A protein has these predicted regions:
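Glycine-rich FAD cofactor-binding loop and adjacent beta-loop-alpha segment at the N-terminus
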Residues: 2-77, 83, 96, 100-107, ...
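Conserved mid-domain beta->alpha element of the FAD-binding
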Residues: 9-22, 158, 191, 273-361, ...
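Short, glycine/acidic-enriched loop or turn micro-motifs at the edges of active sites
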Residues: 34, 164, 299
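Acidic/histidine metal-binding catalytic segments
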Residues: 70-74, 123, 253-270, 327-333, ...
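Helix-loop-beta segment of a Rossmann-like dinucleotide-binding subdomain
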Residues: 86-103, 229, 233
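Helical element adjacent to the flavin cofactor pocket in flavoenzyme catalytic cores
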Residues: 103-125
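Conserved FAD-binding catalytic core of PHBH/FMO-like flavoproteins
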Residues: 114, 128-132, 137-277, 281-287
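C-terminal helical "tail/cap" subdomain of flavin- and related membrane-associated enzymes
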Residues: 321-446
Length: 446
């Protein structure tokens, strides 16, 4: 079978290695960091990950879900914390068996490393950083001291080296692909909430404040990882929070119910890094059939839909199938077939930022959400809320979810047009026979 090299030993690279090795390929993984089983996680370095249907399907096909099960915490919906201190729980789905799962990136990486180590045909090489490409397209590898390392002669290379991909930058520099990195005006910073807090455990907590927000995801040990999303500059921004006093006052004013749950708040705020958020658009993702980008290296996205990891894991599953089907040009086919779905989820992730930070506070938004669930109950084969298509339906491509979501949103906008006095209709006041007909006329069955 083929000898394949994978650049990047994060979750996507490790899953890709396991999938390929199970088909009989020899796989070598090169990771710039030290073995995660020997290292401690850097505080505040990574947003907790949300595992959903697409990622779960890929993990199951690789046979690794059992190893991860104890590290997953189900999140059944959003727990909204309003400025007035009130709270509202909004379930993600009307189906009890549909949840997303919170998982620590460091724990996930360690478990996948263990699985890969035990998988026949996989070799892991730590402290091996890909810093670029040679003239013939093979990677350049260096250790932590920037010393050159030998590069094996392998049939194919897969780059899963993240949003800042050295491989993507090298391909862009030689004109093989076009790429753009688009950063948003908001950065993020993580804070730790220890176990024992009164926060509801099986929920994704959101403190929506319009131009900014705080979220918190549960961990398996009972703690929460909170993340503040805030503008870099301006009157309300990270730039305005340069003193302990400013930080304390900001949290007391905006997040009074959680400020006391974060020990040494000002010290954590000062110690944890402030990181940027952005999207990557690139095409094509391959260099002949020699080299291919997957995951964040090809299509990094902002974290507001919780799909970055799920999309990357779906990449792994689809690429594995293309490599196994015996047809020519699997890298080119992957690049062509997967691009529309990747572009769609990158866009939807950006759109979800506005929803999470602001729209969830709107009466019209919440009415539309109620109506969407009613339409789904009335027309389960025609109307599936966009969030559910993205999160729980791995049989529906991202591009399909985006396009159907636009039609559905137009319907909901029409159903909730305010009256002249600004009042909204109620569900009971709607002409349901009319709207039932509109659903079946505008949406084909799934």
């Amino acid at each position: 079978m083929t000898q394949i090299g994978i650049l990047g030993g994060g979750p996507a690279g490790l899953l890709m290695a396991v999938l390929l090795a199970k088909r009989g390929h020899g796989v070598q993984v090169f990771e710039r960091r030290a073995d995660p089983r020997l290292a401690t996680a850097d505080a505040g370095r990574s947003i907790n990950l949300a595992l959903a249907a697409r990622g779960i399907r890929a993990l199951r096909e690789a046979g690794v879900m059992t190893a991860l099960q104890d590290h997953l915490v189900p999140m059944r919906g959003r727990q909204l914390h309003n400025s007035d201190g009130s709270e509202l729980f909004a379930a993600y789905s009307q189906h009890d068996d549909e949840s997303i799962f919170s998982v620590s990136r460091s724990l996930l990486t360690r478990e996948l490393t263990q699985v890969a180590t035990r998988t026949a045909g996989v070799s892991l090489h730590f402290n091996h950083a890909c810093t670029g490409l040679a003239a013939d397209g093979t990677p350049l590898l260096h250790d932590a001291l920037q010393r050159s390392l030998p590069v094996p002669q392998l049939s194919r290379w897969i780059a899963a080296d993240g949003a800042g991909s050295a491989v993507r930058h090298a391909l862009q520099a030689r004109g093989v692909l076009q790429a753009q990195e688009q950063y948003i005006e908001h950065d993020y910073k993580e804070l730790d909430i220890p176990a024992g807090s009164p926060l509801v455990r099986e929920a994704l907590h959101i403190w929506p404040r319009g131009g900014f927000m705080l979220i918190a995801l549960p961990n398996a040990d009972g703690s929460f990882t909170a993340t503040l999303f805030l503008a870099r500059d301006g009157a309300v921004s990270f730039a305005a929070l340069q003193t302990d006093e400013a930080v304390q006052q900001f949290f007391a004013r905006e997040f009074a119910d959680v400020a006391g749950l974060i020990p040494a708040l000002a010290a954590q705020f000062a110690a944890h890094p402030q990181s940027r958020l952005g999207s990557v658009y690139a095409a094509p993702w391959h260099l002949d059939e020699q080299l291919l980008l997957i995951g964040d290296a090809a299509h990094a996205m902002v974290p507001f839909h919780g799909q970055g990891m799920n999309c990357a894991f779906e990449d792994c599953r689809i690429l594995d199938e293309l490599l196994a089907d015996g047809q020519p040009g699997p890298f080119a086919r992957f690049s062509t077939q997967r691009k529309p779905d990747a572009d769609a989820i990158v866009q939807m992730a950006l759109e979800n930022h506005a929803e999470m930070s602001d729209s969830v506070r709107s009466a019209r938004f919440n009415l539309q959400r109620e109506l969407a669930l009613q339409l789904q109950r009335r027309h389960p084969q025609h109307f599936v809320p966009r969030y559910s298509m993205v999160t729980f339906r791995d049989d529906i491509g991202y591009a399909t979810a985006l396009n159907r979501g636009r039609v559905q949103q137009q319907l909901l906008d029409e159903m909730t047009l305010p009256a002249h006095d600004g009042s909204l209709p109620t569900a009971a006041s709607l002409d349901w026979a009319h709207w039932d007909a509109q659903v079946t006329a505008r949406l084909t069955p799934l």
